[in-house]
Amino acid sequence: MTKHIIVIGGGLGGISAAIRMAQSGYSVSLYEQNNHIGGKVNRHESDGFGFDLGPSILTMPYIFEKLFEYSKKQMSDYVTIKRLPHQWRSFFPDGTTIDLYEGIKETGQHNAILSKKDIEELQNYLNYTRRIDRITEKGYFNYGLDTLSQIIKFHGPLNALINYDYVHTMQQAIDKRISNPYLRQMLGYFIKYVGSSSYDAPAVLSMLFHMQQEQGLWYVEGGIHHLANALEKLAREEGVTIHTGTRVDNIKIYQRHVTGVRLDTGEFVKADYIISNMEVIPTYKYLLHLGTQRLNKLEREFEPASSGYVMHLGVACQYPQLEHHNFFFTENAYLNYQQVFHEKVLPDDPTIYLVNTNKTDHTQAPVGYENIKVLPHIPYIQDQPFTTEDYAKFRDKILDKLEKMGLTDLRKHIIYEDVWTPEDIEKNYRSNRGAIYGVVADKKKNKGFKFTKESQYFENLYFVGGSVNPGGGMPMVTLSGQQVADKINAREAKNRK
């Protein structure tokens, strides 16, 4: 008899798991509370402006392509992606700009400010991150290893310690090899992919630089939501039954097994396995009603990653100095991280990510206008949340900073504005305290590991998404779905012996 899989949540991790389970011959039902598939990969359009509400950068497209290849199909028949050799532009408070290209040689050629020594150090750092990337690919990515003990068993103690560089933080690893203060800050902010601090995260996450340099940085034509649409189409072709606008209210259990879910319609649906794309702590808290003591213990080790104050701006002008992806850096990176991740306050001088897809895709804004998305990282929702007045003052800080750093009269040119706070993110995606990136990567608290993909409390409950390994970001959450499918397939194969 065909076994039934229930997937809770249609984010990239959930839809990826659903596709792989259907490809493996299971009956799969996916329940998504919103009316779209993709989770935070969401879309907003108004007054001729188009905005990616969630992620704006596609990396490691091969992870997505694998899902189509399992069905003997090509992703290019479903969605068009475009490589961006000019990866981004970094603006610094003193007026310095650095353009990051795909390739160290190209970066050197396009930045007269960088010396021969700077480029040699950057190449040396790339070589270091390549070694980490290669070893993480072998075990962490290919085999879905979930814990430090599994890493050590797979690679051997000495090999794991040296090649994963568990001795240093990410910023220590950078500062050890890079002397240019601008490059130090730019490379440290690669930690944005997982919403953490480069001063707290383990050095293993330095691999993010090599990953982007080797795999490239991509744009999904028409908006990144088209990638989610492509995955939804593939899932339906593989026989996944998708229920949008349907919320799971709780998970039913018997001893250490989950038996099914109760929907907001009152209907009970049985399952042999449940895969939750809802974050781990909210799943335990709201769907399984774990006790406060257990939840507090889990949250101490697996604290939420950062959230964001996200502004979607339609502006009645063009800023020629902007590229597709831009970063406006802070005067003091350490203080910025300290305020967000330790003091838990809105930062005085935030580093700001600004994406302007209209630079690549002119369909995203009216002629002569630009669509600007602004994202500084801020703390997740605290026990005493920030007020409307706090956010209003923070908005002014952001606009002041951008105008000071070259976006002249930005306020005057804003003709459309849509803002998302951590509270909006929590409400729409049921994320833990409004975090964007799942669990924070912290060398002391969790050595950079997230929750394991298999529940520690229930034998047939699995998790996917940013709160489990291999972590946050579009390719990683998609990979988590594939890894969970592999685990269930291996378990079923073992049971049949």
From Swiss-Prot:
Enzyme Commission number: 1.14.99.-
Keyword annotations: Carotenoid biosynthesis, FAD, Flavoprotein, Oxidoreductase, Virulence
Keyword Flavoprotein: yes
A GO molecular-function annotation: oxidoreductase activity
A GO biological process held by the record: carotenoid biosynthetic process
Cofactor names: FAD
Enzyme class: oxidoreductase
Catalytic reaction list: all-trans-4,4'-diaponeurosporene + 2 AH2 + 2 O2 = 4,4'-diaponeurosporenal + 2 A + 3 H2O
Record keyword Oxidoreductase present: yes
Pathway annotation: Carotenoid biosynthesis; staphyloxanthin biosynthesis; staphyloxanthin from farnesyl diphosphate: step 3/5
InterPro entries: Amino_oxidase, Carotenoid/retinoid_OxRdtase, FAD/NAD-bd_sf
Binding-site residues, FAD: V7, I8, G9, G10, G11, L12, G13, G14, I15, S16, A17, A18, I19
Family membership noted in the UniProt record: Belongs to the carotenoid/retinoid oxidoreductase family. CrtP subfamily.
Protein's job: Involved in the biosynthesis of the yellow-orange carotenoid staphyloxanthin, which plays a role in the virulence via its protective function against oxidative stress. Catalyzes the oxidation of the terminal methyl side group of 4,4'-diaponeurosporene to form 4,4'-diaponeurosporen-4-al.
Name of the protein this chain belongs to: 4,4'-diaponeurosporene oxygenase
UniProt source species: Staphylococcus aureus (strain bovine RF122 / ET3-1)
Taxonomic path: Bacteria, Bacillati, Bacillota, Bacilli, Bacillales
